C-alpha cells in the first residue's frame, strides 16, 4: 500500500513543494557551475598557452604587469620586490594552472563549495590590484585605466556574487560531489529569497554601472544603449516579474555582444577569451529567467509589508490608547 494515503494532504503538498525546489536548485547549481567554470577554463587555458610558449611568454608577462595589466605598483613590489622568491612568470603560471584546474572542477561539480568561497573573495583582489590613475592634473604618459577600479571590474564583482550563491547552493545533484558524498549535497536547502536578491543585485550592478557611466573610460557597456542598460538594471531591483523580463533583455544583449566579438583573424581560444565573463553572466541571466529572483525583497512586497505593519500599529493604538499616551512621552524624555 502506498504510504502517501497515510500522509495528511498538507504534508504531502509541502513535501512536493520541497522536492520541486530541490530539483530547481539542482538545475540552478548546474547552470552557475557551468557558466563560472567556463570562465576559468578559458582564462587558464588562454594564459597557459602563452606562458608555456617561449616565443610569447615575455609578452603576456609584460601585459599583466604593465600599465594596462591587472597588477598595480603596490602589489608588484609586494609580490616581486627585493627579497621575494616569486617571479612574475612563475606567479602567473601557477595562478593560471590553478585557474584551469579549478574551472574543470567546477564543470565536473567537484569541491564546489570550497572553490566558490575561495573565488568569491579572490575576485575582489582584481579590484584592489588594478592600476588606475585618477588624480586631477596628472599627465598620463602611457595608456592605463582612467576609471575607479570598482567600476572597471564590476563584472568580477558580479561573478563574486554568483560564487557566493553557488557556495550556498552547493554542487547540486548533477555533480561529482553528489556521486562521491551522496545525499548530503544532492538537496540544497538554501533560502532562494535571499539568494535571488543577491542574484538580482549582482546582475543589476553590471547593468547600472554600464548604463550610468557609458562613454567614460574603461566602462563595459556591451555596445548597448545606456538607457536600455539602466532600465534593465532598475527592473531587476524593483519587481520579480520585471526582473524576469529584464533577464530576457540581458540574455539578448549578451548573445548579440558575443556574436559581435567573433573574429576570424583570432584563434578559437582568442575568441573565447574575449567573452569569457559573458558566459557566466549568460548563465546567471538564464537562472533569473527560470528560477526568478524571489519576491520578498521587491518594492511591491516591501510596500505591502509596510502597509500591514502600519495597519497593525493603528489597530493596537485603537485598542490601547492609554498605553500609547504613556509610552510615547516616556520615549521622548529618554531620547531628549
Task: Outline where the language-model segments fall.
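Extended, low-polarity transmembrane helix blocks
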Residues: 2-101, 108-232, 237-336
